[in-house]
């Protein structure tokens, strides 16, 4: 399975912070926001990754992430000049995807919790249909809302309904089979002129091929798209890391523990981080 990180948009809700920098490059406590979505793909075992962003922001992402080989990954890059919908990612990435199944994750979504790596690895084994997650929220009318039966089969999905049929929202991570590009190309723009991810999911739903996996109460899902939620996400990460003494969404550590890089390669990475606490933490992994 291949992975796509969608890190486009103008981040208008975060102005003036995002007037000169991509939202997904802003810090969430001690690391760039993009590290959190990247880490989810890595935990799923996905090593070939396409990052899609604006022409203005791509150079900064390239400088930060490089070709991915330092983490045992392979990065590609593509432009989305204007925000024309999440589902456009599959059209932009058609050549990258080829005939492989694909996971799309939004660059401003942060996940953490018990059992999450196993759920991601299981989802990455998908060969037919599509799989989305369901997360209970108190304000489902703000999200794409999904209804499903006890077997995890989707029954209905709506985008920001006035009267939600459930309190389960669909977070910004989606798994699709190799037919996703063809289906995305058949989508019609919505009233706001975008190719909607909910409409793509509806195509799989209509074919009886949309599965739902619940994220349990032990999983946190944070959307760092506003000043308030960005601060909350940073405070959450700091609290967990200070309490546990372990980092959340550290690509170097994940690459090492997943066997993508060895101890010699990890030690080489620590030299570029100087005397920062981040670098000191990585050195403890080699002790």
Where are these regions (language model features)?
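Active-site glycine-centered loops adjacent to acidic/histidine catalytic or metal-binding residues
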Residues: 9, 108, 136
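Conserved N-terminal catalytic core of the sugar/cofactor nucleotidyltransferase
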Residues: 2-5, 13-16, 26-27, 31-106, ...
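Hydrophobic packing residues within well-ordered alpha-helices of enzyme cores
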Residues: 14, 61-65, 184, 233, ...
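Catalytic-core segments of class I nucleotidyltransferases/pyrophosphorylases
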Residues: 103, 117, 121-124, 153-252, ...
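A structural signal for short hydrophobic beta-strand segments in well-ordered beta-sheet cores
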Residues: 25, 146-148
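Charged/polar low-complexity intrinsically disordered segments, enriched in acidic residues
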Residues: 252-258
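Short, amphipathic C-terminal "tail helix"
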Residues: 260-261, 266-287
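Conserved donor-nucleotide/metal-binding helix-loop-beta segment in metal-dependent transferases, i.e.
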Residues: 113-141
């Amino acid at each position: 399975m291949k992975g796509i990180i969608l890190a486009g948009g103008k981040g208008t809700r975060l102005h003036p912070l995002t007037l000169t920098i991509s939202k997904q490059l802003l810090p969430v406590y001690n690391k760039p926001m993009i590290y959190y979505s990247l880490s989810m793909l890595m935990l799923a075992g996905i090593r070939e990754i396409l990052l899609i962003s604006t022409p203005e922001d791509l150079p900064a992402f390239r400088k930060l992430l490089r070709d991915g080989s330092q983490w045992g990954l392979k990065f590609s890059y593509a432009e989305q000049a204007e925000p024309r919908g999440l589902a456009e990612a599959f059209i932009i990435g058609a050549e990258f995807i080829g005939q492989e199944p694909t996971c799309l994750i939004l660059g401003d979504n942060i996940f953490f919790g018990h059992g999450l790596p196993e759920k991601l690895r299981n989802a990455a084994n998908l060969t037919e249909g599509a799989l989305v997650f369901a997360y209970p929220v108190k304000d489902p009318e703000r999200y794409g809302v999904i209804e499903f039966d006890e077997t995890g089969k989707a029954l209905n999905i709506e985008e920001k309904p006035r009267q939600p049929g459930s309190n389960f929202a669909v977070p910004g991570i989606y798994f699709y089979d190799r037919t996703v590009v063809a289906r995305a190309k058949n989508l019609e723009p919505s009233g706001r002129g975008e190719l909607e991810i909910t409409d793509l999911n509806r195509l799989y739903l209509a074919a009886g091929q949309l599965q739902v996996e619940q994220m349990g109460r032990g999983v946190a899902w944070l959307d760092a798209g506003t000043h308030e939620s960005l601060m909350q996400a940073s405070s959450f990460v700091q609290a967990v890391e200070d309490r546990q003494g372990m980092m959340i969404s550290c690509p170097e550590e994940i690459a090492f523990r997943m066997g993508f890089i060895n101890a010699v390669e990890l030690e080489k990475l620590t030299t570029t981080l100087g005397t920062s606490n981040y670098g000191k933490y990585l050195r403890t992994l080699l002790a």
